[in-house]
A protein has these predicted regions:
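Short, motif-level signal for alpha-helix interfacial/capping segments enriched in acidic residues
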Residues: 20-30, 59-60, 89-104
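Functionally important transmembrane alpha-helices
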Residues: 69, 79, 83-85, 89-136
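Alpha-helical transmembrane segments of helical membrane proteins, especially in multi-pass transport
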Residues: 72-76
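The feature captures the transmembrane alpha-helix scaffold of multi-pass secondary transporters
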Residues: 33, 37-38, 66-70, 90
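Membrane-interface helix/loop boundary segments of multi-pass membrane proteins
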Residues: 46-71, 109-113
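Transmembrane alpha-helical core positions of polytopic small-molecule transporters
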Residues: 3, 35, 48, 65, ...
């Protein structure tokens, strides 16, 4: 039950602070790259701690590891939903986020080390953030 509250708190914090929108706004304005770097360094590791270090690990105590990975990935995708941007291609984005959550959940289950999925997450965010900058 605690992980449900934690997930709700994460979604609320992300939406209230506008963390994902901040990255897009920062890029479109072409300023505050130090703020962008800070987001890239902090958001990925923080999400890994919450979704895999807390939620997935807690679920593994009561259900099968694969079920915990799949539920954790689903919750990861749900946490990235922006109700204001629902519909169209955004649904694919949310499904991809869930799939990414499953992949890094599997990496965590295999390695039993949060640093590895946090690095993968940070690299993924860095690449997907840099591509629009490079290819406009």
């Amino acid at each position: 039950m605690a992980f449900v509250w934690l997930l709700g708190a994460l979604v609320l914090i992300q939406n209230v602070l506008g963390l994902e929108r901040t990255v897009v706004t920062t890029l479109s304005e072409g300023i505050r790259y130090s703020r962008l770097v800070t987001l890239l360094i902090l958001v990925g590791p923080a999400e890994e701690v919450i979704f895999h270090g807390v939620i997935q690990r807690s679920l593994e105590d009561v259900i099968d590891v694969w079920a915990a990975i799949l539920i954790g990935g689903l919750l990861f995708g749900v946490a990235h939903i922006d109700p204001a941007a629902m519909g169209g291609g955004n649904l694919f984005f949310y499904a991809a986020q869930g799939g990414f959550g499953v992949i890094v959940g599997w990496i965590y289950a295999r390695s039993n080390n949060l640093v590895i999925p946090a690095l993968v997450h940070g690299l993924f965010v860095a690449i997907t953030t840099a591509l629009p900058l490079v290819f406009g």
